């Protein structure tokens, strides 16, 4: 009898483990984008020097701003080409790597030439900054050139699937590569042309297989700035994504004021189906950084989006069957001015002003129980120091800038993070070297902690812990509770931009140079 009970208990434990051990195929939890995972049995600490709790380590480039995602036995992350894995890919490139989840072996990579007509369109050495979204055997990504690509999860090793077959030309540097012009000089977006000698890089088994490609510059009319930073949201047959439309190299001019900030593509073909119609682009202070989220509010599905103009929007998703050849306009449900007292006209004259400027939003809007949690404020490089964490009532409609605010909590200085909302608590880190825990219901501060370094990553809650890396290379693990408790502080010696990801009882931590798989 005791053996039978033990067997049943063991079976129950295995089932429970299987329930919480799962892939993490996109940035943030499900559609809500909350930085919270149901994973269990995760390590509290690790040590790369001694190997404690280290499952494997993979070498990356020298700049890694992309967060790892895990799906179907593979780990995906973007980096640069300063540590090339294939000698045919030389020089500055954006690189997107696919590793074996079991052992960290490189399975394939997408290596894309940088834009050359203007350094501010594809910043040198920045690499591939966007985070992938995976569904089945397809990987969706915005690459460093500002193109949305759909990739075969198995790479070219199983053949070149279509309809896109021109990988050789896409991996080869264009002939019209030129030095970056002086600020203010008129430049035009380059197109990819074969080199004059006709020699194309021949892709091999280690290269990516592009299934389709949508060029945001040529086909959506955007002007990219600094780097494409996006995380594609999948809803049914559609892809929702921010375009990275921004200022030019003067930081005082929008070259594409009529371009969309939020678009919808067909996930099977890459065809443009819909865009926003809110004139967002003309008032973008720096760039369109924030990816969209989605939730059901009172039985109604909504797309939430933070524009580069500092406005938080809710849109209705488009219908299942979009009209052929007609780009729809997304229907707005509400708008919320995140910083109503900020300048609204001639906004770029405030560029570089640390006391007064518009606000923008880098992190994603997080939906939990009819409320949106958004962090934003003055731009890290060009704006004022002020920043806030705000809670918005997502059940309202129209202009809810006044009546939609539930609470506002001041942060120390600038903010790049997406909030993590767990068990009635909100965790957020800012660039003023402070980590915050506040009440989700009213924004009441519970505790703060002085940390070493600015934070570009987001806090990540899993297994009763909060994981957080900083730009100084320090890595923290806090207890996810109302009373402050620091469980671990490590010095990883290399800056961290990426958010931690938990999947299948493993946490994945990316520094600028290495990807660690950590298992208890």
Spell out what each predicted region is:
Residues 1-7, 520:
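Positively charged n-region of N-terminal signal peptides that target proteins for export
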Residues 19-520:
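Noncatalytic, solvent-exposed loop/strand surfaces
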Residues 6-17:
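Bacterial N-terminal signal peptides
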């Amino acid at each position: 009898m005791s053996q039978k009970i033990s067997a049943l208990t063991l079976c129950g434990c295995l089932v429970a483990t299987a329930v919480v051990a799962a892939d993490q195929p996109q940035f943030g939890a499900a559609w809500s984008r909350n930085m919270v995972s149901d994973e269990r049995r995760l390590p509290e600490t690790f040590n790369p020097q001694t190997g404690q709790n280290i499952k494997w380590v993979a070498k990356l480039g020298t700049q890694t701003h992309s967060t790892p995602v895990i799906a179907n036995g593979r780990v995906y992350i973007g980096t640069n080409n300063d540590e090339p894995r294939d000698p045919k890919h030389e020089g500055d490139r954006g690189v997107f790597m696919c590793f074996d989840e079991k052992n960290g072996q490189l399975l394939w990579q997408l290596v894309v030439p940088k834009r050359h007509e203007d350094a501010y369109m594809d910043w040198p050495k920045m690499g591939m900054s966007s985070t992938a979204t995976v569904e089945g055997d397809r990987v969706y990504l915005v690459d460093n050139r500002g193109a949305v690509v759909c990739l075969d999860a198995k790479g070219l090793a199983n053949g070149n699937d279509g309809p896109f077959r021109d990988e050789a030309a896409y991996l080869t540097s264009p002939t019209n590569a030129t030095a970056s012009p002086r600020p203010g000089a008129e430049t035009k977006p380059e197109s990819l042309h074969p080199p004059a000698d006709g020699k194309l890089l021949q892709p091999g088994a280690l290269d990516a297989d592009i299934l389709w490609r949508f060029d945001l510059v040529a086909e959506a009319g955007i002007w990219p700035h600094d780097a494409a930073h996006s995380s594609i949201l999948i809803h049914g047959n559609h892809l929702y994504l921010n375009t990275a439309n921004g200022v030019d190299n003067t930081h005082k001019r929008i070259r594409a004021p009529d371009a969309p900030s939020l678009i919808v593509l067909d996930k099977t073909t890459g065809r443009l189906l819909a865009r926003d119609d809110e004139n967002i682009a003309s008032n973008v202070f720096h760039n369109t950084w924030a990816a969209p989220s989605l939730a059901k509010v009172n039985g109604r599905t909504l797309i939430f989006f933070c524009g580069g103009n500092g406005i938080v929007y809710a849109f209705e998703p488009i219908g299942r069957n979009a009209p052929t050849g007609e780009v729809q306009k997304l229907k707005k449900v509400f708008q919320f001015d995140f910083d109503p007292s900020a300048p609204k006209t001639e906004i770029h004259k405030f560029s570089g002003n640390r006391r007064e400027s518009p606000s923008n939003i880098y992190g994603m809007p997080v939906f939990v129980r009819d409320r949106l949690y958004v962090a934003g404020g003055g731009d890290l490089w060009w704006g004022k120091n002020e920043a806030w964490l705000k809670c918005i009532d997502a059940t309202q409609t129209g202009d809810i800038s006044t009546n939609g605010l539930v609470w506002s909590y001041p942060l120390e200085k600038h903010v790049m993070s997406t909030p993590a909302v767990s068990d009635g608590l909100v965790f957020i880190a800012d660039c003023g070297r402070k980590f915050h825990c506040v009440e989700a219901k009213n924004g009441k501060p519970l505790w703060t902690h002085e940390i070493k370094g600015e934070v570009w990553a987001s806090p990540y809650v899993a297994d009763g812990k909060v994981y957080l890396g900083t730009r100084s290379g320090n890595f923290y693990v806090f207890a996810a509770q109302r009373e402050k408790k620091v469980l671990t502080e490590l010095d990883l010696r290399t800056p961290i931009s990426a958010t931690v990801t938990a999947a299948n009882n493993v946490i994945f931590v990316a520094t600028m140079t290495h990807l660690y798989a950590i298992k208890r």
